[in-house]
Design a protein with these regions (language model features):
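A basic, amphipathic helix-loop patch mediating RNA/tRNA/ribosome contacts
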Residues: 12-55
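A positively charged, amphipathic N-terminal helix/segment that binds anionic biomolecules
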Residues: 2-4, 58-70
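A detector for short, charged/polar N-terminal pre-domain segments
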Residues: 1-12
């Protein structure tokens, strides 16, 4: 499981989170994977590329999980 700290920010957009963590090499690829329904947020398929991910949420892509903390 990966952990990502927002470091004082209120949120991070879903496509940026996948890129920053290193699960994808580009934001464009992240957007494509999200629009294809391959990413879940809190157990639900998320199709919004710019979905705001906040503290306490869990993002899943393939077999990887990302927990977002403050």
């Amino acid at each position: 499981m990966h952990e990502f700290e927002l470091e004082g920010h209120e949120f991070i957009e879903l496509h940026n989170l996948l890129k920053v963590i290193g699960l994808v090499h580009s934001g464009g690829l992240a957007k494509t994977l999200i629009s294809e329904g391959l990413v879940k947020v809190d157990g639900e398929v998320e199709l919004r590329k710019r979905c705001k991910i906040r503290v306490g949420q869990l993002v899943e892509f393939e077999k990887e999980q990302i927990k977002v903390s403050a």
